[in-house]
């Protein structure tokens, strides 16, 4: 096909489009890589483009800018491109550049077509490429895809070809000139809106320089931040305390601003600290700002005989010393509370006085050690001695302003003041007189008053009233005594010091006195001492002194700082605090904001951090704010209305500002603390911490009454008040004797639709546990054995729990959790299935995150609690229930008893011609049918397991005469038959009874059960009132299988047979009635072969004959007529054992066959037909 040169473009190429040029070169390396090379002025790196296996597209390798090259075959129906070899156009956005190459219908894509693609622009244009010389002409398969529509292309436009690629190499210089023109136009159109990344150019590799920052993406180093990839994301190291600060004892702390070591609590006298740690240097290397401590060496001469210089502790480096380097030296004896001395090779500090909390530790040399280091100890001046003496006397007397060293000394001194107030004469009237007296309030009859009443003169009455009013007015910092009538002042009752306690008495006392006879009225005898106003004032001073002594240490702070509002109890503390504000100007550095003084630059810098984020105290009632809390407290008084504060939002009233502030903060503040686990938010961080306990698994608070655990202490307190309230317990005890009248809430039709039913109340339940709870609450006298539904097995799902970090699989979530904690520490645990929330619309299934898979269901017998009616699927859960609900029985051995029905099985009869019908219960049929369908392989009977077969021959009478007969209950070991005449199948279980099976006979155990059976052939159908056929207490005999083939002299005929097939592992379900056992048979016919061996007839009584037979039944599915040859061949395979032969050889064996057919009626019940073939 010839190429038309000089054909115009399909789309006109504008100037602005010509600037964005690119060249696509094919790299002849196996025909798999193409390369797009941009012009130099575009400042773009080269991109390698790799096409896919079908050669239909190319994908860029570069991650920052993707380039996709699509190669499409042209539809053959479009004659537009028949004369053009190729058409290429570009579509470009911010991150993707798409180059589409169009091929004629008859042309295939090969390496020659990818040689050069030049002039590709944003607008589509045509390009003509002639085949290049045979360079990698390996043909690429191009699928016949339909050509995608191209914007701007008109179907009527004629596409002419461009110059051939052969001429491209010859005219390369012309192309370079065109590229230069395009670059010039691009620079003119540039409006300066390009980002820095567009102007970024790759730098040449730099040599190693420790000051350069390495960028792995650029594979180069930069002087600072990488201009293309930006700054790194640093994670700083965790700060570590120095050795000196980390070794500080817990009872001490270092002041951040002043330095020095202070006590957190009271440290008693004679407490030792140490030893001191630090480097040893010469004296000339010591610094003056620290105490100088010298170490006494064991020998002044070293091993070489040279004289050793004295060594001192250098205490200036925190990384080499311990906390004792921060203890500052004392300037005088008043400040000193530690002594330094050497003991052995170490230096210790010992307290010489009691150190109070927040008191600085200051040390000086001991007397002998000071002489060793050539220092003097601090002498005690008279002023210091006086101050020390006053400090030791912490018990002042406010009557005479004396101070004492102990409370005992103060009490003895107060007794001397009491002697001056000896104006009361005490009496001893106990048992001295027989006159009846009426005493004051608070004294019961028979007890004398503590003090006598006094007559107070009228001139002193007014003075006493004034003194009483002064007594009631105490300091505002002290407590308020409202009930002054019952107070005691230094042995004096207040009621006896007021006017109301005079001889006049109260109105009640006057009335009682008037009712007494005149000879029984006692009049108090006044002494010569009279309570004067001076005595009252003295008593007031004693009372005030005692009360002020009790509360002054905690509440009374008379010395207040005018700058910050902080108050102190002693003036010395205030003076020490004022020095922090720089009042004296002794500090070299002062804060410009608060004028607080500091001794070091680091202390001032730490202080300035508080001003950067200084707190402001805002009023909750108005927009005003304060920088100090005491100013806010003084301000909020203006918002008091009628003695109460009102909430500005809900208008709730409070008597205290603290209460209204807590109310506003809790209910009307912005909730900025968001819970990360749920959507709740809180206004305070402490409330969020309390809420986070809801999402944790820890329950640290245990109720001592019921054993319930809680995550929070307030929830435990609320539980105790609500559940264990004495009133509630009394009401609960009163309710136990009264039972509510039960009214059925369901109709009879709804009742029949439930799986679990209470037949007494005619009530249905959806789950087993609901029925168990109902029976234990409403019918505690009813036994579980009486409810057939509760004896059915429990069907629970079986899951596999996968470890998401390895290939381990576990059967329980707890074992998987233990595995992850042990082998994958720190890994996230999968969520619990019980705590999953249902997925919302559009959300993924939450079960996918649990890494579990349902593998089937497991039917397990229920495990009953021996102390209540609860049932569980495993013994472990039952034991947990006993420990929680029956702790008094938790230490006793637990015996698990599975429920067994005691109902006698129904007896099946046969008349010889027609089968007898047994109709099963609808509920039990449904339950056992579902059970048989959901059995897993774990509960299938293994080969060689023992099975259980029950049968009852029906007694038949002839002429009114009955003869008893011993029928055998045999436990037969069942295995697959190996006979070539029988088909081999797996062992049959309850879910596989519909399959054809063959059985072999093995060693059996024979147990004898006596029932009555007629001897005559008359066919009548009276049932034997028997009991459940279960292994009796008699000793079983071992019978060899060969005995079953021994000929017998008697044959049993016309007897109905009942059989049951249950795995021996289900011991708890033996003893089911026949309708439960028979209903598990699917629809079909089953043959029972009966082999009877006769025994000598033993006379039992008149008219009765006792015969012992050995009968064996083999269950097999078959036709209506049993093949006698197969039965005889089975009998010939066994060899008789003479040791076990109990019958003569002349007895002939006879086999009787029974056919069991199960059908289903229209009403859903099952019927069992037993007949002879």
From Swiss-Prot:
The keyword Nucleus applies. Keywords: Activator, DNA-binding, Metal-binding, Nucleus, Repeat, Transcription, Transcription regulation, Zinc, Zinc-finger. Residues 248-366 form the SET domain. Pfam families: PRDM2_PR (PF21549), zf-C2H2 (PF00096), zf-met (PF12874). Residues 172-202 have a biased composition (Acidic residues). Residues 267-371 are annotated as: N-terminal PR domain. Residues 926-1153 are annotated as: C-terminal glutamine-rich region. Belongs to the class V-like SAM-binding methyltransferase superfamily. This is PR domain zinc finger protein 10. It comes from Xenopus tropicalis.
């Amino acid at each position: 096909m010839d190429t038309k040169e000089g054909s115009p473009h399909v789309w006109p190429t504008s100037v602005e489009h010509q600037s964005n040029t690119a060249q696509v070169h094919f790299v002849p390396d196996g025909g798999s890589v193409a390369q797009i090379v941009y012009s130099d002025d575009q400042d773009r790196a080269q991109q390698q483009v790799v096409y896919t296996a079908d050669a239909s597209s190319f994908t860029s390798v570069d991650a920052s800018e993707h380039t996709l090259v699509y190669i499409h075959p042209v539809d053959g129906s479009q004659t537009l491109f028949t004369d053009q070899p190729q058409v290429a156009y570009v579509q470009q956005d911010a991150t993707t550049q798409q180059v589409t190459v169009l091929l004629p219908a008859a042309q295939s894509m090969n390496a020659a077509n990818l040689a050069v693609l030049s002039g590709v622009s944003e607008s589509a244009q045509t390009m003509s490429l002639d085949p290049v010389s045979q360079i990698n002409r390996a043909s690429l398969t191009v699928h016949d895809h339909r050509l995608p529509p191209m914007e701007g292309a008109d179907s009527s436009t004629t596409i002419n070809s461009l110059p051939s690629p052969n001429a491209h190499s010859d005219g390369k210089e012309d192309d370079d000139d065109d590229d230069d023109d395009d670059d010039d136009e691009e620079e003119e159109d540039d409006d300066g809106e390009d980002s820095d990344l567009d102007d970024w150019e790759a730098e040449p590799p730099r040599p190693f320089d420790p000051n350069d920052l390495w960028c792995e993406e650029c594979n180069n180093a930069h002087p600072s931040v990488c201009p293309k990839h930006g700054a790194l994301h640093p994670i700083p190291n965790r700060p570590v305390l120095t050795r000196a600060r980390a070794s500080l004892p817990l009872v001490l702390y270092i002041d951040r601003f002043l330095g020095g070591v202070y006590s957190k609590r009271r440290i008693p006298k004679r407490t030792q600290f140490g030893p001191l740690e630090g480097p040893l240097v010469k004296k000339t290397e010591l610094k003056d700002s620290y105490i100088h401590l010298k170490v006494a060496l064991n020998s002044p001469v070293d091993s070489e005989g040279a004289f050793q210089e004295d060594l001192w502790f250098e205490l200036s480096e925190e990384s080499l010393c311990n906390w004792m380097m921060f203890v500052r030296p004392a300037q005088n004896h008043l400040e000193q509370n530690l002594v330094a001395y050497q003991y052995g090779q170490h230096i210790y500090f010992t307290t010489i006085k009691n150190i109070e909390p927040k008191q600085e530790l200051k040390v000086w040399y001991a007397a002998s050690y000071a002489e060793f280091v050539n220092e003097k100890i601090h002498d005690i001046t008279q002023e210091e001695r006086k101050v020390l003496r006053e400090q030791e006397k912490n018990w002042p007397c406010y009557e005479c302003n004396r101070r004492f060293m102990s409370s005992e000394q103060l009490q003895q001194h107060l007794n001397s003041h009491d002697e001056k107030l000896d104006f009361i004469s005490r009496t001893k009237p106990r048992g001295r007189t027989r006159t009846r007296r009426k005493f004051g309030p608070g004294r019961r009859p028979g007890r004398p008053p503590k003090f006598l009443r006094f007559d107070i003169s009228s001139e002193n009455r007014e003075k006493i009233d004034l003194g009483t009013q002064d007594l009631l007015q105490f300091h505002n910092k002290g407590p308020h005594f409202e009930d002054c009538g019952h107070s005691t002042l230094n042995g004096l009752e207040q009621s006896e010091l007021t006017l109301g306690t005079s001889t006049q008495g109260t109105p009640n006392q006057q009335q009682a006195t008037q009712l007494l006879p005149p000879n029984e009225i006692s009049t108090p005898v006044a002494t010569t001492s009279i309570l004067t106003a001076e005595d009252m004032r003295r008593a007031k001073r004693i009372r005030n002194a005692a009360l002020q002594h009790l509360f002054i240490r905690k509440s009374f702070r008379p010395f207040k700082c005018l700058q910050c509002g902080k108050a102190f109890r002693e003036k010395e503390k205030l003076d020490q605090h004022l020095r922090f504000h720089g009042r004296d100007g002794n500090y070299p550095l002062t804060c410009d904001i608060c004028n607080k003084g500091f001794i070091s630059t680091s202390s001032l810098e730490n202080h300035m951090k508080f001003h950067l984020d200084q707190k402001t105290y805002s009023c909750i009632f108005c927009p005003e704010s304060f920088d100090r809390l005491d100013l806010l407290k003084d301000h909020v008084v203006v918002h008091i209305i009628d003695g109460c504060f009102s909430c500005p939002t809900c208008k709730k009233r409070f008597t205290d500002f603290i209460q209204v502030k807590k109310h506003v903060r809790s209910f009307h503040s912005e909730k900025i603390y968001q819970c990360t686990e749920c959507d709740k938010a809180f206004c305070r961080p402490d409330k969020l911490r309390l809420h986070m306990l809801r999402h944790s698994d820890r329950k640290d608070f245990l109720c001592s009454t019921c054993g319930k655990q809680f995550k929070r202490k307030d929830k435990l307190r609320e539980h105790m008040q609500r559940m264990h309230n004495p009133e509630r317990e009394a009401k609960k005890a009163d309710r136990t004797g009264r039972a509510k009248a039960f009214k059925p809430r369901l109709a009879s039709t709804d009742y029949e639709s439930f799986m679990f039913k209470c037949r007494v109340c005619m009530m249905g339940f959806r789950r087993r546990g609901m029925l168990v709870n109902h029976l234990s609450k409403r019918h505690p006298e009813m036994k579980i054995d009486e409810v057939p539904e509760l004896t059915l097995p429990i069907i629970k799902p079986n899951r596999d729990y996968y470890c998401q970090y390895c290939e381990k699989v576990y059967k329980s979530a707890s074992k998987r959790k233990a595995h992850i904690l042990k082998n994958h520490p720190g890994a996230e645990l999968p969520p619990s299935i019980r705590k999953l929330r249902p997925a919302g619309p559009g959300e993924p299934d939450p079960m996918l995150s649990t890494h579990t898979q349902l593998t089937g269901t497991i039917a397990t017998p229920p495990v009953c609690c021996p102390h209540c009616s609860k049932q569980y699927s495993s013994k472990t859960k039952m034991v947990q229930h006993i420990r929680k609900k029956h702790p008094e029985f938790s230490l006793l051995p637990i015996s698990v008893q599975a429920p067994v029905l005691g109902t006698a099985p129904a007896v099946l009869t046969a008349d010889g011609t027609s089968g007898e019908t047994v109709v099963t219960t609808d509920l039990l049929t449904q339950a056992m049918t579902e059970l048989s369908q959901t059995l897993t392989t774990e509960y299938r009977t293994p080969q060689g397991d023992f099975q259980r077969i029950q049968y009852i021959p029906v007694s038949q009478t002839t002429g009114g005469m009955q003869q008893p007969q011993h029928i055998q209950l045999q436990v037969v070991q069942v295995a697959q038959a190996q006979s070539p005449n029988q088909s081999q199948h797996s062992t049959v279980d309850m879910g596989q009874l519909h399959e054809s099976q063959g059985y072999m006979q093995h060693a059996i155990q024979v147990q004898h059960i006596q029932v009555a059976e007629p001897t005559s052939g008359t066919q009548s159908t009276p049932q034997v009132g028997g009991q459940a056929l279960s292994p009796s207490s008699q000793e079983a005999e071992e019978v060899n299988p060969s005995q079953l083939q021994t000929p017998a002299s008697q044959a049993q005929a016309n007897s109905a047979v009942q059989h049951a097939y249950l795995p021996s592992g289900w011991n708890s379900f033996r003893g089911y009635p026949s309708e439960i056992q028979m209903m598990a048979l699917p629809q079909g016919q089953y043959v029972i072969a009966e082999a009877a061996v006769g025994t000598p007839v033993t006379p039992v009584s008149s008219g009765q004959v006792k015969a012992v037979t050995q009968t064996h039944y083999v269950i097999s599915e078959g036709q209506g007529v049993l093949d006698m040859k197969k039965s005889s061949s089975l009998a010939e395979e066994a060899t008789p054992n003479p040791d076990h032969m109990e019958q003569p050889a002349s007895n002939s064996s006879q086999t009787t066959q029974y056919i069991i057919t199960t059908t289903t009626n229209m009403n859903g019940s099952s019927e069992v037909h037993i007949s002879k073939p």
